[in-house]
Regions:
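N-terminal auxiliary interaction/assembly segments of multi-subunit proteins
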Residues: 1-165
Length: 165
């Protein structure tokens, strides 16, 4: 019987994945913020960029990395080693590529920890959506886990929705 997808397993796995990727790619520390209740139905928290990567197998679901514009530009600058005033960090294609790589690596690390816990699964391709007032809604039948991280004064939200396979 496959292990259960507990809140502790999910929070620990995403925290390790985010911390490892940010330390390696951005050379920055991240700090998980205290656990908060998932947003209520109809909640109005919005973002300008959503990066999602799904996974299928003994665990099925999707991880959304949710960023405001300031965080997406910060990630792009740090990953590419750009100066704070370099306009390249605001180029939509450059931001998409940088954040997409961070999302793929982060969810890959998360998936590896699920595999290590006895829940083998594989990743889907990353998807990046950019716009105004973007929201993540709960998928039908999925358990939702929302974990916020702080990095250099910026906030990253990992919105994880999953089901046991």
């Amino acid at each position: 019987m496959a292990p259960s997808l507990t809140e502790t397993l999910v929070r620990t796995a995403i925290a390790r994945a985010v911390q490892n990727v940010f330390a390696t790619m951005l050379r920055r520390d991240t700090t998980p913020r205290p656990a908060a209740a998932p947003p209520a139905a109809g909640a109005t928290r919005t973002f300008q960029l959503l990066a999602s990567v799904g996974f299928v197998g003994e665990a099925n679901g999707v991880v959304y990395l949710c960023l405001q514009d300031d965080m997406s530009r910060f990630v792009t600058r740090e990953v590419l080693g750009l100066s704070p005033d370099d306009p390249t960090a605001s180029d939509p294609e450059v931001v998409r590529d940088a954040v997409g790589e961070i999302a793929n690596m982060t969810v890959g690390g998360f998936k590896n920890q699920l595999c290590d816990a006895g829940l083998p699964c594989m990743l889907t391709l990353p998807t990046i959506v950019r716009g105004n007032d973007l929201k993540v809604i709960t998928l039908k039948g999925a358990d939702r886990h929302v974990v916020e991280f702080e990095c250099a004064g910026h906030i990253l939200v990992a919105d994880i929705q999953l089901k046991a396979g």
